[in-house]
Amino acid sequence: MRIWAVLASFLVFFYIPQSYAGVALGATRVIYPEGQKQVQLAVTNNDDKSSYLIQSWIENAEGKKDARFVITPPLFSMQGKKENTLRIIDATNGQMPEDRESLFWVNVKAIPAMDKAKTGENYLQFAIVSRIKLLYRPQGLVIPPEQAPGKLEFTRENGGLTLFNPTPYYLTVTDLKAGNKSLENTMVPPQGKVTVNIPGGYTGGDITYKTINDYGALTEQVKGVVK
């Protein structure tokens, strides 16, 4: 592999959901079914003039590096207009919860190659980290994932709206509205709850929302009732 020296006075890191400039990931989330030996994630450099050093790693739900999943190759160089495949391998040894999904994060850092014309100069270097969900999904969960969005429950608590998720799946909730009031997007863990603020002036009315499915697409709008 070609070795790059990144020589700059400043190296700045940014976290973004999926892609930066010419470097893009092939999905917005990765589902890892229990029992599968590995899953794959495509990485593409769409920029024909730029090369990147790609570094990848897995973090747990708290944002700490986690060895329960192995990602390979962890480091490689990528020329313009090329595609590579990251392999994610289960190293959990059967030690994951069997009644719900578990959340991890896939991180892919793209470091642009140094411009040889600027060798010895001080300039700003941007390294971008794309970060997407990795959801480990056990077999035999009580309901299929397609039914989970309609199971959300809503209650008013301390001036906010509490979302309770009784399902075994992580639910990413978007386009959430209370009456005509738009609320913040959120992610509700399995068997867990999250509270979001309700803007002043809400006097009741239907709750409507969408969720994001396994393919990164929005589901149809769902109506909920505040209990």
Swiss-Prot record:
SUPFAM superfamilies, A to Z: PapD-like (SSF49354), Periplasmic chaperone C-domain (SSF49584)
Record PANTHER family: CHAPERONE PROTEIN FIMC-RELATED (PTHR30251:SF11), PILUS ASSEMBLY CHAPERONE (PTHR30251)
Subcellular location: Periplasm
InterPro entries in UniProt: Ig-like_fold, PapD-like_sf, Periplasmic_pilus_chap, Pili_assmbl_chap_C_dom_sf, Pili_assmbl_chaperone_bac, Pili_assmbl_chaperone_C, Pili_assmbl_chaperone_CS, Pili_assmbl_chaperone_N
GO biological process: cell wall organization; chaperone-mediated protein folding
Predominant cellular place of this UniProt entry's protein: periplasm
Protein role: Involved in the biogenesis of the F1C fimbriae.
Family to which the UniProt record says this protein belongs: Belongs to the periplasmic pilus chaperone family.
Entry keywords, A to Z: Chaperone, Fimbrium biogenesis, Immunoglobulin domain, Periplasm, Signal
Signal sequence annotation: 1-21
Keyword Amino-acid biosynthesis (UniProt): no
Provenance organism: Escherichia coli
Single GO cellular component term: outer membrane-bounded periplasmic space
The protein, known as: Chaperone protein FocC
